[in-house]
A protein has these predicted regions:
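Residues at alpha-helix caps and immediate loop-helix transition turns in enzyme cores, especially N-
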Residues: 33, 85, 111, 147-148
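Acidic/His- and Gly-rich active-site-bordering loop/insert found
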Residues: 2-103, 124-129
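A general structural motif
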Residues: 68, 130-132, 157-159
Length: 240
């Protein structure tokens, strides 16, 4: 089968994946690393004899063919912060029990790199298609997709497109994400002095904590709230 051609590049692909994972490409925090990840993909495309182009500060594409309809494959190279609870190095490739581990392997660096290698496999096989394939790469998907908004101000919309940014099965929609700012009035006896729950709104934090300064401390009420909720809770308090 033609699809098996990708297996010829397995070792080379895994080596490149390790390099791609090494970039701590958190948009808004590590913009230079986002640049490095995008430049790496475009450089590898050049190595393979493909046509790559940096289109905006946060996007680029690799094109195969120049006729017919334009088919886009959209992937992203940015990741959410890794957090502190990894059992393996998050920014390196680890193979364990038949699985690959590293921040971004599933979302979406693995698919981004496989897309590049699929174009390489097609090119090396001498396939002459009647349509144009374009792999589109962004580095701001996790922070609102401003990368694609700006990309399509300068580049045409594909006639057809998909993104390999999901588990197996074809999806045409995704659940939404609602970002809220909540404010409330506290009584004079209680002050919310600290509240921390990770570094990204679209990732489950490994740890969250709140600090209250209160002269009306009710341990039993807090215990009942904890028992009614999911997760593990730990209470530390001092009494003046």
């Amino acid at each position: 089968m033609f699809g098996n051609k990708i297996l010829d590049f397995k070792d080379e692909l895994l080596k490149d994946l390790n390099t791609l994972l090494s970039f701590e490409s958190v948009d808004g925090e590590k913009n230079d690393e986002c640049d490095n990840a995008l430049n790496f993909i475009l450089k590898r495309a050049e190595d393979f004899g493909l046509t790559g182009e940096r289109t905006t500060d946060k996007s680029g594409h690799i094109t195969f063919g120049d006729s017919g309809k334009l088919c886009g494959v959209l992937t992203h190279l940015d990741v959410v912060p890794a957090g502190n609870s990894w059992s393996v190095p998050p920014y390196a490739l680890t193979e364990k029990d038949g699985r690959l581990y590293g921040r971004g392997i599933a979302d979406d660096k693995g698919a981004a790199l496989v897309t590049l290698y699929c174009l390489k496999a097609i090119k090396d096989s001498g396939v002459k298609g009647v349509n144009t394939l374009r792999a589109i790469y962004g580095t701001g998907e996790e922070t609102g997709m401003e990368d694609m908004e700006n990309y399509f101000k300068k580049n045409p919309l594909p006639d057809m497109a998909f993104t390999p940014d999901s588990d197996y099965g074809i999806c045409f929609a995704e659940k939404g994400i609602l970002q809220l700012e909540v404010s409330t009035l506290l009584n004079n006896a209680t002050t919310l002095s600290q509240f921390h729950a990770g570094r990204a709104v679209n990732a489950v934090p490994d740890r969250a904590y709140v600090m209250l300064d209160s002269s009306d401390y009710d341990e039993q009420t807090l215990m009942r709230l904890a028992d009614a909720s999911d997760g593990d809770f730990e209470f530390n308090y001092t009494i003046d």
